[in-house]
Swiss-Prot record:
Ligand binding (deamido-NAD(+)): N143, R147, K180, D187, H267, K268
Organism: Pseudomonas aeruginosa (strain ATCC 15692 / DSM 22644 / CIP 104116 / JCM 14847 / LMG 12228 / 1C / PRS 101 / PAO1)
Pfam family, one: NAD_synthase
Protein name: NH(3)-dependent NAD(+) synthetase
SUBUNIT field: Homodimer.
């Protein structure tokens, strides 16, 4: 199993475990510089990111805000901005956490787009949903939610001349735990290559409250399973996923689940097929 662990870790460009606080600070500086370079290369000056209330978007948001603040200071150009976007579906169960994230990030600008009416209007027009079992329909609509959020973020970025930030990291990438062309769609992914505990380490070092750093992760896309934990969907824990990514020992069954899921979701990590 160790060779497949190494192969997958290499494919996902997994970063080595942090050995010290200096390693954490180095990763923060590296990723802020990456965000800044993406803006410079694009010729654009605005960043857009959806804030969910989870640690991933919180961490990416903190990095983004620091990136534009530093650019303003370095260049004197006040046009560099970060827009944090709330994209609730109706009333979000953990709205308090989302608001706490916004208060922590203190973005240059905040916008709210309730995706509920758009999701409902589209679902009502889809004949393919008719007659589906409730759980299957709920799952499909959950992916619609993720894709509507993508549309909203790109609309804002298009209107304001900006780039959309993604929150994907190695622990989600290995499990394919994102919606294809939904939350998997972005212009830059500053958390790439990080294990889940490393994302938390960055969040903690950036000043995030501990209750948000250690919050139980949930995609919260399905109405029939509100607040359903990521780990319950995975069938393995994030600690096991992180151990796998870093080539450390873990339960044989957990390793098998991760490898099987990685292969099953490979299409999500590839460009569209072409002749």
């Amino acid at each position: 199993m160790q060779q497949i662990q190494r192969d997958i870790a290499q494919a996902l460009q997994v970063q080595p475990p942090f050995q010290s606080e200096a390693d954490v600070q180095a990763q923060i500086a590296r990723r802020i510089a990456f965000i800044q370079q993406c803006l410079k290369d694009s010729g654009l000056k605005t960043l857009v990111l959806g804030i969910s209330g989870g640690v991933d978007s919180l961490t990416a948001g903190l990095l983004a805000q620091r990136a534009v603040e530093q650019l303003r200071e370095q260049t004197g150009d006040q046009a560099y901005r970060f827009i944090a976007v709330r994209l609730p579906y109706q009333v979000q169960q953990d709205e308090a956490d989302a608001q706490a994230s916004l208060a922590t990030i203190r973005a240059d600008e905040e916008q709210t787009v309730n995706i509920g009416p758009s999701v409902k209007a589209l679902a009502e027009q889809l004949e393919a949903l008719e007659g589906l079992e409730p759980a299957k329909s709920d799952f499909v609509i959950g992916n619609i939610k993720a894709r509507i959020r993508m549309v909203a973020q790109y609309a804002i970025a298009g209107a304001r001349g900006g780039l959309v930030i993604g929150t994907d990291h190695a622990a989600e990438a290995v499990m394919g735990f994102f919606t294809k062309f939904g939350d998997g769609a972005c212009d830059l992914a500053p958390l790439s290559g990080l294990a889940k505990h490393q994302v938390r380490a960055l969040a903690r070092a950036l000043g995030a409250p501990e209750n948000l750093v250690e919050k139980i992760p949930t995609a919260d896309l399905e109405d029939l399973r509100p607040g359903h934990p990521d780990e319950a969907s995975h069938g393995v824990t994030y600690a096991e996923i992180d151990a796998f990514l870093h080539g450390q020992p873990l339960r044989e069954e957990a390793a098998r689940v991760i490898v099987d899921t990685y292969h099953k979701t490979q299409h999500k990590r590839e460009l569209p097929k072409a002749p």
